[in-house]
A protein has these predicted regions:
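P-loop NTP-binding core
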Residues: 1-317
Length: 317
């Protein structure tokens, strides 16, 4: 590992269709190309990230193979769920596949709690403890990868619900993908409020990695205005790299490939490479130990009397 510790990054935005899965897939590919060991986690019940790598969630279910749902319902370690791709990115990229029923995980856990409460007569405090433990199961599961991976990227569903909350509790960073749309930018206030509450209550180490603008058309005045608005609102947290609109995104998804595999010479691949480099630099700057303070230089002594006698100088009275 080239980082002091594994870094977990959540891609978060409750707005659907804002490029979360596309960004997650291609950022994972970019990190792997740069030589980092990466695990990509699919928490979206649509399973777009999972299918993008040619993994069929229905087939996994039919064959009884574990998915990320098992981290919640069975407390399975992520190391037992990982799917590897030895023939892609030198084996540096792995996947925790999603499950179509992931949006029912919270309800299933609540049903289990009610059953236990009836059978064992749990107190309200014990019920609260169970709910807290349920929200921390993803974090506990991912801990099994901490010594094996440089980065863990988590793709989340388009809502402020159980899955996103558990992801933010497990993360060091959150990255906000947005499209150049008023609807995308309007929803950021609620997301930042959610993050603030999680930081205050349970995860003080959670920090904003950046806001990345995608589907950008530089010839459109509105898109330029939205870019300026985001730059003004987020300042240095707004990513310098902007991902332009391109049919190559849809083509790569259809081919079940990252943009680096599908169109390595296209400007879109170059933009995701630039974004990867920018985000790595941000993480490295943050993790770098603070420089030691400069030693204080003692002031030169001042003398009110005659100059000091030089060594070896003979005094004449």
């Amino acid at each position: 590992m080239r980082l002091p510790a594994c870094q977990t990054v959540v891609l978060a935005n409750q707005k659907g269709g804002c490029g979360k899965s596309t960004t997650a897939v291609n950022l994972a590919g970019g990190l792997a190309r740069a030589g980092y060991s990466v695990c990509l986690v699919d928490l979206d019940p649509q399973c777009n990230t999972t299918t993008n790598f040619g993994v069929d969630p229905e087939e996994l279910h039919e064959h009884g193979k574990p998915t990320i749902l098992d981290a919640y319902l069975k407390s399975a370690p992520a190391s037992a769920i990982e799917v590897g791709f030895e023939d892609r990115f030198d084996g540096l990229l792995t996947l925790l596949p999603g499950h179509r029923s992931l949006d029912q995980a919270e309800a299933s856990l609540e049903a289990k709690l009610k059953s236990r409460s009836v059978e064992e007569g749990l107190s309200p405090l014990e019920e609260d403890d169970f709910r807290h433990e349920s929200r921390m199961r993803l974090r506990k599961s991912l801990a099994s990868l901490q010594k094996e991976r440089d980065f863990i990227l988590i793709d989340t569903p388009p809502r402020l619900g159980f899955e996103l909350t558990t992801a933010l509790l497990a993360a060091n960073w959150y990255l906000i993908p947005v499209f150049a749309s008023r609807y995308d930018t309007d929803g950021l206030t609620r997301l930042t409020q959610t993050v603030r509450k999680i930081r205050q209550r349970a995860n003080q180490t959670l920090n904003l990695l950046g806001v990345v603008l995608g589907n950008f058309d530089p010839s459109t005045t509105l898109h330029k205005q939205i870019r300026e608005t985001l730059q003004g609102k987020f300042g240095d947290d707004f990513c310098n790299t902007v991902i332009h609109r391109s049919i190559k995104h849809a083509e790569a998804t259809f081919a079940k490939q990252t943009i680096f595999e599908h169109a390595p010479g296209h400007q879109t691949a170059a933009q995701f490479e630039e974004l990867t480099t920018e985000l790595i630099a941000h993480v490295e700057r943050t993790l770098a130990p603070a420089a030691p303070p400069e030693p204080e230089v003692a002031p030169s002594p001042t003398h009110d009397g005659p100059p000091a006698q030089a060594v070896g100088e003979v005094s004449h009275g």
